[in-house]
Amino acid sequence: MTRRVVLYIDSLKTGGAERVTLLLARWLSEDGWLATVVTRHGASRDFYPVPAGVQRIVEPSDPVWLRLFGPLGFPVRVRRLRAWLRRHQPDLVIGMTTLPAIKLLLACRGLGIPSIVSERNFPPLKRPGLPWRLLRRLTYPWAQLHLVQTQATGRWLAQHLKAQPQLLLANPVVWPLPRFSPDPDPNDWLASRHVRPQDQVLLAVGTKAHQKGFDRLAAMFELLSQRSPQLHLVILGLESVPYHGVDQQDQLRRLLPQASQQLHFPGRVGNVQDWYERADLFLLPSRYEGFPNVLLEAMASGCCCVSSDCPQGPAELIRDGVNGRLMANDASPAEWADVVSTLLADPELRGRLADAALDVRDRFSERRLRRCFMGGVSQLIGDD
């Protein structure tokens, strides 16, 4: 009999958690499972294509009367999800990110369905509201397995939430990187903004400007742009529409009034590998991470990378001075500017660091991490 697995996440918008959700679903589907990805939000928010063989279901929207209750309607939403699970009777459920995991664990309570939780950020630096923290403390011990991306995250979850057992599963790099639309050619797009082929380009990628430290990046670029008027900063992932009420593009433009012609926002793209290959340097000045997909992908693409040594993940990818540069998490804009200037002026050094970075293709290969994940699933459901 075909086993059924449900992966539950808020949406399939741009982001590392969403990509990993679809990757796990594909692995399970290719292993013979009937894999279903359930999201709270509909296809209008989708960015990533659903893999062949994976089902996609959107939770029924709340009736008008339930929407009137706002957060107070959460228990009813849990009961509706529980009823859906009773009807479909999956053999395994996986909750991706904190809030969907909490809701899924509550909905599964007492149904006898094995559950996996995948925390996607470093919990003490991305604190949910108090009610969610209390519910997380209550529910996380119920899960039969916790996927953790770093040892530090695993230690915190075990110490503070009694989240055991755990499987250490870093993000894999799928090489070559998947391609999908929109896929603007970086050279053509930049040329339309008067960026010449010989002009140097700094690249950053992310959808959450504060977490990714793009304000830090702007402060550093302000120093560099004064010295190098032909240097350009490209930030992928930020959209022109507000994010949680904040126009992130406009916010960054205001930080760089003298360099507005050197700051570029292509938005979301599905051919990010092409942009890594066009860039002279990839920069990740994040305040915190779970495990930085974009840094992993940039290194796999042979791009010379500079990252903050933030919690958690960059230090597990970069060996400073060997396969990239690792900056102190509290490094000043001037310190960043000095390191970036040195690398821009030394193509031989950039090439050496970029070549060494390619080892992530093997260290974090899909083959290795797929075997690890499927082994954990087999042990959980008793297939050993």
Where would I find each of the regions flagged by the language model?
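N-terminal strand-loop element at the rim of the active site
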Residues: 7-15, 19-23, 27-69, 153-158, ...
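A conserved mid-protein helix/loop that constitutes part of the nucleotide-sugar donor-binding site
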Residues: 18-23, 200, 204-223, 334
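Short, structured helix-loop element that forms part of the nucleotide-activated donor/catalytic region
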Residues: 46-49, 232-261, 349
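Short His-centered aromatic/hydrophobic patch
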Residues: 95-101, 119
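Acidic anion/phosphate-binding donor-loop and adjacent secondary structure
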Residues: 127-128, 155-159, 172-192
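Aromatic "clamp/platform" in nucleotide-sugar-dependent glycosyltransferases that forms part
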Residues: 268, 287
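Short hydrophobic beta-strand element within catalytic cores of glycosyltransferases
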Residues: 304-308
